[in-house]
């Protein structure tokens, strides 16, 4: 474990499910999101060779930015810019393509918009940005 930089610490019994869910978000969902991106690129006509090169480059950049800036400041894209019109357009396109992907996009966009509020205000506001 120390080779990963792991450290021992105590997690209260009542928090273990949340702790493990955090690990799922940090590791298990990354391949799911990567696969989804590849699927969308393929459907939109991006050649496989290009998407296979694009994906690791984007993931590496995201991880680098998280390490350097922290997760909140590393956020990019339409939610970070509060480009609600583009978010709606992408959402509508995804709803025509695949409902589970559209639902994931909607849920993750809400989390991203909450992060924007944290970045701008230093705390989550009671009135989130509407999508």
Where are these regions (language model features)?
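NAD(P)-dependent Rossmann-like dehydrogenase/reductase catalytic/cofactor-binding core
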Residues: 52-131
